[in-house]
Design a protein with these regions (language model features):
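Multi-bladed beta-propeller domains
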Residues: 102-119, 145-163
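Short, solvent-exposed, polar/charged sequence segments at loop or secondary-structure edges
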Residues: 1-34
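A flexible loop/linker signature enriched in serine peptidases of the S9 family
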Residues: 79, 90-97, 113-116, 133-142, ...
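Hydrophobic beta-strand positions that form the internal "hydrophobic ladder"
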Residues: 86, 127-131, 171-175
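Hydrophobic beta-strand positions in blades of beta-propellers and related beta-sheet-rich domains
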Residues: 37-39, 86, 98-100, 142-144, ...
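Residue-level detector of Asp-centered blade-edge/turn motifs that repeat once per structural unit
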Residues: 80-82, 125-126, 169-170
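C-terminal/domain-edge helix-coil "capping" segments
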Residues: 29-30, 43-110
Length: 186
């Protein structure tokens, strides 16, 4: 089945399917790939839409994630996360690394390497910045990392603890926990 054919929904319904994705991938004359898909509601017999993309070989994974996001949103009503990125910290021996990767763990890139702990990575809602806590100064300090440029800026380095960065929903503000005067405060 490709995206131009209407599937036999009765047959798929008998097999217990609720939905069906059909598609095709074709090599174009310029070396790119034409990727197309269509989603079907097998129960109602409805076409739920589809998309087409012309991409390079290097972008095939990204397109697969976009297709998965589209299908997930159509079936659940919630945005998919397949095209998003994750941030995580690893520790090897006495060395810590802050990593940024695709949601499936592929394309991991090291954002920071330190002999001191790195904790609490928190994405800005638009995915362009990442706040985290680093102990490079032998105390917790909050930084914001710009994903595109790789540059970071110091956000909170007050006396006491600076921790738990959390972005506002609009991404314009960042709340942090401080203990400047003995007790923890936001």
């Amino acid at each position: 089945l490709d995206e131009t054919s209407r599937p036999d929904v009765a047959q798929w319904r008998q097999k217990g399917a609720d939905s069906l994705a059909t598609g095709s991938i074709t090599r174009l004359a310029d070396g790119r790939w034409d990727v197309r898909f269509r989603l079907w509601d097998v129960v109602k017999g409805q076409d739920l839409g589809g998309q087409g993309f012309a991409v390079t070989t290097g972008d095939l994974r990204l397109v697969a994630h976009r297709i998965a996001d589209y299908i997930y949103e159509k079936l659940t009503g919630e945005k998919g996360i397949f095209s998003t990125r994750i941030a995580y910290v690893t520790k090897a021996g006495a060395h810590y690394r802050l990593w940024i990767a695709d949601a499936d763990g592929e394309n991991a890139q090291s954002a920071l390497s330190s002999p001191e702990p790195i904790i609490s990575p928190a994405w800005a809602p638009n995915g362009t910045q990442l706040a985290y806590v680093s102990f490079e100064s032998r105390k917790p300090v909050v930084y914001v990392h710009d994903v595109a440029s790789g540059h970071r800026r110091l956000l909170a380095n007050f006396r006491g603890s600076n921790s738990a960065p959390a972005w506002s929903p609009d991404g314009r503000r960042l709340a942090v926990t401080l203990s400047r005067d003995g007790g923890s405060q936001l």
